[in-house]
Structures are given as structure tokens and as C-alpha cells.
């Protein structure tokens, strides 16, 4: 869908980087949908947080989600809800955007997003 490349100063989190999460006040997770659920890469990062969980290092930190799906009804809300279990187990505080933009109630054009988080449609080719 002709999206621009990722800016150089935006880092991608890998399972070996998860201990860095401890140093942040809040974390926004950008998650794509795979058949209505979170992709394996995101699940791997979540599963790598055992040490942080065991020591309560993410307790009280704020968390949010923005998501991308290939199509309408592609799982934007279910992706956000799938992240809730991780946030709850870590003791994180989920911050929702709610319906802050009046465009959420407009049906004149196709757009993503929900009270669970900001969203977009990437098309079937990602």
C-alpha cells in the first residue's frame, strides 16, 4: 500500500533486547495481525520476558497497542485483546486511546482503529 520505509531511528525489539524494557516508563507495541492473532515474532518477544516478570520489572509501566491488519475485520481488536494477557501478567497498565477522533464515526472512507488502539489496513501484501 505504498507505505514509506521505517525511519532509521526507530528500533525493532528482538527477544535478546527485552531487558531494555525495564528502562522505559511506558511502551507502545506495534503489532501486525496474523489470521486475527498476534504473529509468532511478537509472541516470542512476550515469552522472552520471564526474567522481567519474575522480578516484577514491568509492574506499573504503561502499555498501549497500535495494530495493522491486511483487511477490514482482519483482527485489529483481537490483536489488542491478545496483548492484554501479557500486560496483566506483567502488572502493566493498559492505556486505551478510546474514541478520541471523530473520524471513528465516519463511514465516508475506510479506516482502521478502535477504542483498543490505533490501527491501519496494510493490504494483503503487508
Which residue ranges define each predicted feature?
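N-terminal beta1-alpha1-beta2 submodule of the flavodoxin-like/Rossmannoid cofactor-binding fold
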Residues: 1-57
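Glycine-rich phosphate/pyrophosphate-binding loop and the adjoining helix
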Residues: 9-13, 98-126
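Residue-identity detector for threonine
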Residues: 14-16, 44, 62, 69-71, ...
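Short, surface-exposed, charge-dense and proline/glycine-enriched linear segments
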Residues: 18-25, 88-95, 124-126
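Short amphipathic alpha-helical segments at helix-loop
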Residues: 30, 68, 124-126
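Short, glycine-/small-residue-rich phosphate/pyrophosphate-handling segment
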Residues: 59-112
